[in-house]
Regions:
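Acidic, metal-coordinating catalytic segment for phosphate/diphosphate chemistry
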Residues: 11-141
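An N-terminally biased module of ancient metal coordination in phosphate/nucleic-acid-related enzymes
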Residues: 4-6, 10-11, 127-187
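A short, glycine/Asx- and small/polar-enriched loop/turn
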Residues: 1-2, 42
Length: 187
């Protein structure tokens, strides 16, 4: 796996210079005008893309959608006489470079007649039809979580005591927790 970073800046060269100077950089793989890739700790590839504010939403949408979702979104745009890429929504075959939408993800989806589709649903598995009909499901949020059924304390390999974990659970509004420390080996 790799790590992808998306950064908004009017000064991409300064951002990339700073990124390349990161003390954990093993070596640079590639550097372009808006994208830099490095080999970081433990051999992990880290890719960074820098875009302007007017394109951040389009880039965020592009990089958080599956390939299938993005192909379908571009196909929909094309039928409407539009083009979508990581820089924004433009009129198809335009030459002036005017971006119609791109600052926010909601603007990108609105430009093609859709409600915003959350990243978790961007798989081309029915989300377009649901969005067209205003029927996208409500996703689970932190307030929906009632408890935690897998927790380890300092008695084994956890980082907090039982009392600390219980207090943290109360602070977070949890109704229950289950301590699942490892059993001591029986010989």
């Amino acid at each position: 796996g790799d790590i992808d970073l998306l950064v908004e800046s009017r000064k991409p060269n300064e951002v990339m210079d700073h990124f390349l100077a990161w003390e954990h950089t093993d070596h640079s793989i590639v550097r372009g005008d808006t994208k830099t890739s490095i080999r970081g700790p433990h051999g992990i590839q880290v890719d960074m893309r820098v875009v302007e504010k007017k394109s951040f939403g389009a880039a965020w949408q592009y990089f958080t959608g599956s390939k299938e979702h993005n192909v379908r979104l571009r196909s929909r745009a094309k039928k409407l006489g539009l083009s979508i890429n990581e820089y924004g929504v433009t009129e198809l075959n335009q030459t002036d470079g005017k971006i119609l939408a791109g600052k926010s993800e909601k603007d990108v989806y609105k430009a093609v007649g859709l409600d915003w589709i959350p990243p978790e649903l961007r798989e081309d598995r029915g989300e377009f039809e649901l969005s067209e009909n205003g029927e996208l499901p409500k996703l689970i949020t932190l307030t929906d979580i009632c408890g935690d059924l897998h927790m380890h304390t300092t008695a084994t390999d956890g980082e907090a005591t039982l009392a600390e974990m219980a207090a943290a659970a109360v602070d977070r509004g949890l109704s229950y927790i289950a301590i699942t420390d490892h059993s001591k080996r029986v010989t």
